[in-house]
Structure formats: C-alpha cells, structure tokens
Amino acid sequence: MTFKNPFIVRSLTAWAVALLIVAADQVVKYVVKNHFSLFESVEVTPWFHIFFTENTGMAFGMQFMATAFLAVFRVVAIAYFSIVLRRIIHSQLSWGILVCFSLIIAGAVGNLIDNACYGLIYTESLPFGEPAALTAWGEGYGSFLSGRVVDMFYFPFFTWPEQLPWIGGQTFFGAVFNLADAAISVGFVCLLFYHKTILEHHLFRLPTFRKTEAS
C-alpha cells in the first residue's frame, strides 16, 4: 500500500518519529527502574555512566515548579507544539523542521507519562535496596501527577582543575538526563540554530481568520 498524499505521508512520518522516541524512552526507563536501586551506577566507559536517579522537575533535573503544575505545563506545551506541527505539515516546510517538532513533542510526552503514572504503578525506589517493581494501578508510591521522572544518562567528561575559582573540582556536564530530555534539547537546539527564521515565522504567528459575508 502506498500513500500519494504528501500531507498523509508527512503526518505519518511526524507521529511515527514521536511514537518511536516515546516508546524507546519508556523502555529504557522500565529497564532502569526495574533493575537498579536508586543512585546505583554502572560505568559503561570512564565518560559514560548509567546512573539511576529521579526528580520532580524539568529536563536535566531542574526544579522550577510543583509537580502538578509542571504536568499541566507539559500538557499545554504538547497541545501547542502539536498545533504548530500540524501547521508545518500543511506548509510543506523541510523534513528537518518536522522532525524537530516531533522530537520536542515526544520528549514532553515521555516525561509526562512518568509524572502522571509512575506514582500509581511503581513501588518506591530506595537507595541501595531492592529495585522498584510494577504494582496494581493506584497502589504505587504516590498519586496521579505526583510521579517522579526517571533519569539515567550521565556523562562526566572531565573534572575542572581545583585551582579554578567557582568551578574547580566540579564535573563538566554533571547533569543526569533521560532520552526524553535529550529529544527536547536536540529539537530546540536544531530549531534555534538552523531554522531561526522559519521558527519565528511559524511558531509565534497567531492564526488569522477570514471574514465571511452572511448569506
């Protein structure tokens, strides 16, 4: 079966990319959540560790608002960027723009799933104890919208020299993040650096409506 309608092809591609990222993000989180104790770390290479941690904040563990408000923010962002993505699909802009918005939406959805559901379906992750386990719906460690986001990717590339002020002895890029965070970051960075003009034109332009005469 072939699709000759460009709108259908672009729509299917955009949402397939988003679905693939969300699925991969959740699979990685499932493996880590079910096999690692909280703060457990496995060194893959000297500069790449799998380090299990959880947070209630935004990407890379940043804390700005309460978990429930953050969930609402994510829902609004997903809805907004989905509308923008639909406009981009119709406008026949480049595939790169389309994929960027798919990545951003997928990342927001991936972390929203943690935020909304993990408190309901997982037991508590404890430091140096037994890994968490799936449980019956509603019997987890928290309530709806109180789930903690699972992070695991840690890249301690190097440590700053001790003699440097403020940053001496600290690890360069000490953030722990997940695949959803990476998708959001890659999507935004590519848009800002490579598609600035198109971003300004399509992301911030308000919709216009044509006036019609009454019959």
Question: Where are the regions that the model predicts?
Answer:
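Alpha-helical transmembrane bundles and membrane-interface segments of multipass inner-membrane proteins
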Residues: 1-215
